[in-house]
A protein has these predicted regions:
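Compact, glycine-rich, soluble single-domain proteins
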Residues: 1-83
Length: 83
């Protein structure tokens, strides 16, 4: 698989099922930041959007071999480089 790094930083909300991104920065604070770090969502981590609920929120992401659902409001605080 060939990946081309985008130069624009967006939020994790911007990727759709089948798209990849690399985590750039996590803006969340407190317990939410700790939860995201605990599930392996750290800067530099590759993430794939693998699905979304019928309503569009939450989306499911493949993170370090585990599928994790993240709400849109939390995705907005995760900045990424899309591939």
């Amino acid at each position: 698989m060939l990946l081309k790094e985008a130069s624009i930083t967006e939020s994790l909300n911007s990727i759709n099922p089948g798209e990849y991104a690399k985590v750039g920065q996590i803006l969340s604070r407190g317990s939410m930041r700790r939860r995201l770090l605990d599930i392996g969502l750290t800067p530099g981590t590759m993430v794939e959007c693998v699905g979304k609920s019928p309503a569009g929120d939450p989306k499911a992401f493949l993170i370090r071999g585990a599928v994790i659902a993240i709400r849109s409001e939390d995705c907005a605080d995760i900045l990424i480089n899309q591939y």
